[in-house]
């Protein structure tokens, strides 16, 4: 799962917009918004383009794109 808040924060930090990223990825802003919100699947090629545009390093990839959702978990 994508860490939506972290990714949106990076978009703002790098002075990008969903519209600009969507153009680079090759989809509509609406579709990219769905993907970032985990409402539609994002493929690895799209994630790599976003990483390139937002200067997300290889070692940071998992922090943005591989978050697990933990619900109803008791320790």
Predicted ranges, named:
Residues 45-60:
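DNA major-groove recognition helix of helix-turn-helix/homeodomain DNA-binding modules
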Residues 27-42:
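Recognition helix of helix-turn-helix/homeodomain-like DNA-binding domains
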Residues 18, 29, 47:
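Helix-turn-helix DNA-binding elements, focusing on the entry/boundary residues of the two helices
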């Amino acid at each position: 799962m994508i860490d939506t808040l972290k990714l949106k924060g990076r978009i703002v930090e790098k002075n990008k917009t969903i519209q600009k990223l969507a153009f680079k990825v090759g989809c509509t802003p609406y579709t990219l918004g769905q993907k970032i919100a985990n409402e539609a699947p994002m493929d690895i090629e799209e994630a790599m383009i976003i990483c390139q545009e937002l200067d997300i390093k290889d070692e940071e990839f998992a922090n943005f794109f591989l978050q697990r959702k933990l619900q109803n978990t008791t320790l």
